Amino acid sequence: APLHTMLNAGVTVGLGTDSVASNNRCDLIDEARFCGLIHRAESRDFKWPDADRLLSLATLDAARALKLDASIGSLEIGKLADLVVIDLSRTHGTPVHDPAASIVFSAEAADVLLTVAGGQVLFEGGELKTLDEQALRDAVNRALTRMS
């Protein structure tokens, strides 16, 4: 859908992912990047949407779309402590002139160092902290085998 048209009409737009069944990847950085590139090419305005707008679509605007902006979507007193720490020092992301642009247009999932949701560390040092990733993969594969 044309992002500019929806935003001008007052539609609350948020970016997100649903499952690999429909999109092959659950990577919100990719979603923001593709949203920006697609709409820049479509509008021929190669500066719109800018990286700040794309990050907002993936964070606070997404929370607004879900009517959860009172508790998530931005770092504010009283909201849940949800955050992601991204390493922008790797060669594919340097030099960093604009951190938002570096996140949206250069970062990738492998650059994520830490993920915290509701104040709980979920991912750190390349490992899921609250799930047994191998057990989860095994369960998914067993379910897939039963459905085949």
Language-model features, listed with the residues they occupy:
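Short, exposed beta-strand "edge-strand" segments with a Pro/Gly-rich flavor and a Y/T-containing core
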Residues: 1, 24, 43-49, 94, ...
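His/Asp/Glu-enriched, well-ordered alpha-helical/loop segment
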Residues: 3-90, 106-107
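Active-site microenvironment of metallo-dependent hydrolases
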Residues: 56-148
